[in-house]
Amino acid sequence: MKKRILLGANDVGNGHISRQKCIIHELQKCNVELVLAVTEKSIVQYEAAFPEIKKIRINIPWIQCENDGIDFKETLNRYRNTKMDQFESFLEFAVEARQCFDGCPPDIVMTDFEANVTWFAYAMDLPLICLDQQSKLLYIGEEEIDGITIARDRALLRFYFPKADHRFISSFYPIDIEKKEEITVLPPVIRNLKKEKMDRSKIVVYFSPFTNDVKLLEQVLDMLTERTDYHFVVYSKLDFKNYEQYPHLTFKRIGETFENDISDCCCILSSAGHQLISEAISLDIPLYVFTFPTYDQKYCAKMVERYKLGKTMRRFDQIEFDDFLQNLELYRRSISAFRKKYWTSSWDDVMLDVLNEKYGIHRM
């Protein structure tokens, strides 16, 4: 008998969607029936990738944070300004989820940092499986990086996902977690990318939709305008009309061409998002990263430098950029050695071994 799985995915940035597409593709090979809980913003992507899978629309609650945890006052202000009844929205989802499998509820709930399906699992006393990369922040050492503490990220995890039947944690870097039956650390959950012959003059720049901080992104672009010895392919949801005059800058929207562009570039300039860093490592691509004011990004950038996978932008100037470019070959060798040392198994095999043992989910 097929297991009925309700899977919910966050839509902030592109990392959650990219990761869940990989997981859904693997689950489709198994003895399961899937229903997806996705937002209006992301449903187009899921519909294009999985037209045969039923989808339930959700609205994701947004919690405002400050450095020591949740900012309840700002969260209240934002909630009032949205003029949407979040509880009513959840109940509408729950009514549909309760009978989403031809009148039957799911057997198992899976979530990638999505709260609606989590609350539903708790209310229905269903097994909840977390499939994300943020859960590692519950277990890694407590510290502060550049004035940003881990308290914010941990507060969100405790607020949304205080308890899980199992946590699969995707991580591009090694993490020392005390062995627990309900936790499995996976090699990064990424798609299989094909590496092409390198174009040494081509650099991909990725601006995550996570931020609208134009001032920060323009700092990066200002640094690039002087480097006419390279061609920069810039992916962004924002328009930068003042920079379109530079012939060595090409602007694109994130889409199908992104995979082709990173397959042959010589390096990537990006925010320190876990998913893209992981994909770059899989292709031996050095990273020059800037960070958003979150502990997760600060920690990812710290790991990039610790293992010599690239460099963090601090000054946004030509001297620092030159230092990065002059060491590309060193970074490539370090990335290759790092991957061979730490990525010794396949994420899908590790995940499915656990799913089979605990829940009877297996490839058909």
Spans of model-derived segments:
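Donor-nucleotide binding loops and adjacent catalytic segments primarily
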Residues: 24, 189-192, 197-266
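Conserved nucleotide-sugar donor-binding subdomain of glycosyltransferases
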Residues: 72-108, 115
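Conserved nucleotide-sugar phosphate-binding/catalytic loop shared by glycosyltransferases and other
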Residues: 11, 35-86
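Conserved nucleotide-sugar donor-interacting segment of glycosyltransferase catalytic cores
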Residues: 96-154
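Catalytic binding pocket for nucleotide-activated donors in carbohydrate/polymer assembly enzymes
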Residues: 276-277, 281-332
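A nucleotide-sugar donor-handling region in carbohydrate enzymes
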Residues: 139-212, 235-238
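C-terminal amphipathic helix plus adjacent low-complexity
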Residues: 326-364
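A donor-sugar binding/catalytic signature common to diverse glycosyltransferases
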Residues: 109-113, 130, 260-300
